[in-house]
Amino acid sequence: MSKLLETMKQTKDMIKNYRKYLKKIENSIKTILKDSQIFLFGSIITGNLVAGSDIDILIIANVPKKHLKRAELIAEIEENAGLPLSHPFEFHLLTQEELNTWIKIYKLRFEDISAYLES
């Protein structure tokens, strides 16, 4: 099987079994950004999750303004959670103030990650 097809199959399997990964992701986020709040939004909470979807993870924390620093935090979260280079999880780091703006502009609907963790 080609590397591309293997990656696509792995991503599809991760979407199908996303709950298995969420606890590792939550633990990683809480280790790196101790006072963070973690939510899910997008197709995962609207019930429209399909094989080609991503899983949007919203992290509210006291994060740096610079996008490069945020990208470094995301890379650290991914590595600490043991995620492969290609995965369906899309991380969004926001401050509380930025979240308030997002809610006004995008009418954002989100739910706490705990509702989606494997029991």
Name each model-derived stretch.
Residues M1-Q37, T46-G52, A61-S119:
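Catalytic core of pol beta-like nucleotidyltransferases
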Residues F41-S43:
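Glycine-rich beta-strand-to-loop/alpha-helix junction loops that act as flexible
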